């Protein structure tokens, strides 16, 4: 890979949110630039969700260490949406300081320039996984290659760029013409970045997760399960159920009886034993986990009435199926 190429002087990491290996492999004809790059398939983290995976990328730590163990986390007093860094009452930065919730230093303390949406700069999640970096916000995607080119010309050894268009389209529209059009746009974006790179710069393209089309396959929890549940966290395809006091065993039995045909029903102890979140799980991170995880195996999602939105998500992620967990790591080294 380019890390061992003595020709490489600078590096750019571009993360395309939601660009799964399987989705790209099935659409190489509409993404010729991406399809033509050298590279391989790598695996994301558990759960395959943006907050968890991006934080592992920027800190180099497994979820059990950095502590952002899901999209919605049980923080004791409430369940916090990690991307919004809030709950139904609003922003939680005063009570849950990002640097306390996620204590690992991003980028090993190096002040890396981050090329991401300008509107994301002043958020709790940005503070949690990008603090100490230098924000270089963009308002339209066409600015991304321009900003990267300027940073490289200024001598920056590493540039990190993030683009979320593909993830947004797949959530709202699913796989189809809108997704394909956005994948073409991503391919053009990568081509434009490659064209702007000076000699000796390596470009790495990767992702946080893939997607599966779920649509209206939304499963409600039956009475025998909810009778054992105090609250829920996580997300639809990696749903944590937190048991009522004394109901832990009954919850496991009920979930196996009802959901084992479409999901992996996994206890917290099993997840720890099998190191789903890495070999080390800090006590604070452990407290954020539920008692039982419903990890979708089929193309379904598990509903939580407290985790709603403005529209039904067509594509989802979070589980550990190949379509969600396998992502590309593609490399291009500019040689002029």
Language model regions located:
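Feature captures the catalytic ectodomains and active-site-proximal regions of enzymes
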Residues: 1-336
């Amino acid at each position: 890979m380019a890390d061992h190429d003595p020709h490489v002087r600078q590096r750019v990491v571009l993360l395309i949110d939601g660009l799964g290996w399987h989705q790209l492999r099935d659409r190489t004809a509409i993404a010729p630039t991406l399809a033509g790059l050298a590279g391989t398939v790598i695996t994301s983290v558990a759960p395959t969700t943006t907050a968890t995976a991006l934080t592992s990328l920027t800190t180099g730590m497994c979820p059990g260490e950095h502590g952002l163990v899901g999209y919605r986390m049980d923080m004791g007093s409430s369940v916090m949406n990690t991307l919004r860094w809030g709950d139904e009452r609003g922003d939680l930065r005063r009570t849950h300081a990002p640097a306390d919730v996620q204590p690992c230093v991003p980028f090993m303390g190096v002040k890396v320039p981050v090329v991401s949406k300008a509107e994301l700069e002043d958020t709790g999640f940005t503070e949690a996984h990008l603090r100490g970096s230098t924000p270089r916000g963009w308002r339209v995607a066409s600015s991304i290659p321009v900003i990267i080119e300027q940073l490289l010309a200024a001598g920056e050894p590493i540039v990190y760029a993030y683009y979320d268009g593909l993830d947004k389209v797949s959530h709202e529209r699913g796989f189809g013409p809108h997704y394909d059009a956005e994948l073409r746009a991503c391919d053009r974006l990568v081509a434009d970045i490659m064209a702007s790179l000076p000699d000796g710069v390596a470009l790495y393209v990767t992702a946080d997760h893939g997607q599966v089309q779920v649509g209206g396959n939304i499963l409600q929890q039956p009475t025998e399960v909810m009778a054992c549940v105090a609250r829920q966290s996580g997300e639809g395809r990696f749903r944590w159920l937190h048991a009522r006091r004394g109901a832990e065993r009954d919850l496991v039995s009920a979930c196996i009886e009802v959901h084992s045909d479409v999901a992996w029903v996994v206890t917290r102890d099993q997840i720890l034993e099998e190191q789903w979140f890495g070999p080390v799980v800090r006590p604070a991170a452990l407290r954020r986990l539920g008692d039982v995880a419903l990890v979708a195996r089929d193309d379904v999602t598990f509903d939580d009435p407290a985790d709603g939105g403005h529209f039904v998500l067509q594509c989802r992620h979070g589980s550990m199926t190949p379509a969600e967990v396998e992502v590309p790591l593609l490399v291009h080294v500019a040689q002029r």
